[in-house]
Amino acid sequence: MRIGIVAGELSGDQLGGTLVEALKQKYPNAIIEGIGGPKMAAAGFKSLYPMDALSLIGFLEIISKGLRILSIRRKIINYFKQNKPDIFIGIDAPDFNLTVEKELRSVGIKTIHYVSPKIWVWREYRIKKIRKATDKILAILPFETEYYKNRHKFEAIYVGHPLAKNIPIHIDRTKYRDKLGLKGNSLPILSVLPGSRTTEVSRLLPLFLLALQKLVDAGYKFKAIMPLAKPSLKPLFAKYKEQIDSLGIEVFETNSHDVLKASDLSLLASGTATLEAMLCKLPMVVGYKLSWLSALIGRMLIGNHSYWAFPNILHKSEIIKELIQEDCTVDNLFSELKRLFDDKQRNDYIVEEFEKIHKEMVIDTESKIIQVLNTMIEKS
């Protein structure tokens, strides 16, 4: 069996890593190849191109690096047309993967898109391309199946999110603090996750550090910890080493899972990390900034959308504070961080609600995906 997979960024690599591991157990002799990251490679995946080349965000970044992406996309399409997989799975990265899927489906290759494009937020017209590109959408959020069914008469299959299964409902934080060498710490632990892409980290890290400095100046005592999302971010972190050191922030060259599981509270970028923090039952403050042009065009396309962070989307209310674009200022971050430290009753409520959502999301994701995959292959 030959299976093609393309994951476009770290969150896709996390999903792909557990999926490739499960596929290898089910089909030990399968060739599984395409584009992936370190977690997928560790599970036995062969990456034909570096995943980092696809990890872009915002219109300016796409314009500046778009030609390389288009070149890689054309090469991967040609490769799979010449080395036809039994099935192709595009993990997230819809602007890249839907075109790949459409091209491969046109020559008779079965395609799956894993992680629905957020057409319920913006660019809903993409449903036309989705219909042409993919045989199945695998949804990771519970409400998406009804959205596709009721609004577009298109089948999306809820497979859950592997993080919901892999992260325990009740976390032994002491275990992860010991693992990170924080055994003797008696202060509240605040995890700081400014993103995984160079562009977002360069915008958010300086703001986050200044807000934390104001928190320290106001007399708040805490221990801040921060994961290094990937080695390529080291030069950027080094640029802010003096501030990081003066705040006593420990930077760990480990995945975000361990850092979040060791934490009491979190300050982080909007994105998949907010889902992970929610599953770790962390009250949090979310911030995000795009380039001005990306933000302008994005707002023109999106309009007034209520929520950006996964916890708010899933809870259908602003259960945690999200500070987006011009609201993402040092003063606003500082104000919300103070509330995070001061309002224990609110934090207890947040933890209770996160636990409810987590229980609803638990499903054996990989087994469900393999079941869908088997059915599609048998019918072909």
Curated annotation (Swiss-Prot):
Gene Ontology molecular function: lipid-A-disaccharide synthase activity; phospholipid binding
Keywords: Glycosyltransferase, Lipid A biosynthesis, Lipid biosynthesis, Lipid metabolism, Transferase
Catalytic reaction annotation: a lipid X + a UDP-2-N,3-O-bis[(3R)-3-hydroxyacyl]-alpha-D-glucosamine = a lipid A disaccharide + UDP + H(+)
Pathway named in the protein's UniProt entry: Bacterial outer membrane biogenesis; LPS lipid A biosynthesis
One term under GO cellular component: membrane
Alphabetical list of Pfam families matching this protein: LpxB
Enzyme Commission number, as recorded: 2.4.1.182
Gene Ontology BP annotations: lipid A biosynthetic process
Role played: Condensation of UDP-2,3-diacylglucosamine and 2,3-diacylglucosamine-1-phosphate to form lipid A disaccharide, a precursor of lipid A, a phosphorylated glycolipid that anchors the lipopolysaccharide to the outer membrane of the cell.
Entries under PANTHER family matching the protein: LIPID-A-DISACCHARIDE SYNTHASE, LIPID-A-DISACCHARIDE SYNTHASE, MITOCHONDRIAL-RELATED
NCBIfam families referenced in this protein's UniProt entry, alphabetically: lpxB
Protein name, per record: Lipid-A-disaccharide synthase
Source species of the chain: Francisella tularensis subsp. novicida (strain U112)
Organism classification: Bacteria, Pseudomonadati, Pseudomonadota, Gammaproteobacteria, Thiotrichales
